[in-house]
Amino acid sequence: KLAAKAKGLGIPVFYYISPKIWAWKEWRVKKIKKLVTAMYAIFPFEPDIYARHGMQVEYVGNPSVEELETRLEAAPSREDFLKANRLRDRKIIAMLPGSRRSEIRNNLQVMCRAVDMMPQYRGVIAGAPGIEDEFYRRLTNLPVLHGQTYSLLRHSHAALVTSGTATLEAALARVPQVVTYRANGSKLSYNIMKRLLKVNYVSLPNLIAGREIIPEQLLHMCTPDAVGEKLAAILPEREPRRLQLEGYDDMRARLGQNHAADRTAELIIKALTNK
């Protein structure tokens, strides 16, 4: 609505961070093309999607890269992290079950049962903002850490991650992972989703790399046994783990070195001054 209003007043519209038209509703590009002077994307695969509709979009870099690198550098040492959270010195499997109650409810119990199959590892949950401990306690007795997601990733051996931005964060932190998305767990929902989605993957690392570098266990395939099998494969220092880490390197290279906000500002100034 704001873009349409500005366009009607003759004000140039610069759009930083594209809506996720690549997931579904790609038809929105037609409306965006009419209203937006320039679009700046934060994922390297987005310009090609817009190009199919005759719209030129510039990839400016991804802000998560520098933010995560800064946060990881600020993370406490492993010794201090374990001591502060009263955790024993065992290899950690980070569990990021989502930020909404429905997501957490659908995914966490699958994650917990998968981690139970790895008794030599310790599952630790990244608590979502605004979700109280009591909610998690009704689902599991595993430790829940609030406001420490980046420290948790920094000191984890592997991760179970519900699809979303957290998959990119785990990849940038170089934590081998399995992606889970349970929802209602039905095969019918899976078939509907596959028809609606305009992309081959749901996780950002796979979308950015343009190939599967991390396993995605979705809906009816998101069972404790299936997730546990994929998790067990990436725990030892063997080929599945090595290949995933190499995939992360490829993904990171595709993201580039640009400071996204600075690059966007430069392009907007250039467009406004016609330089």
Regions found by a protein language model. Give the residues of each.
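Nucleotide-activated sugar donor-binding and catalytic core shared by glycosyltransferases
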Residues: 1-275
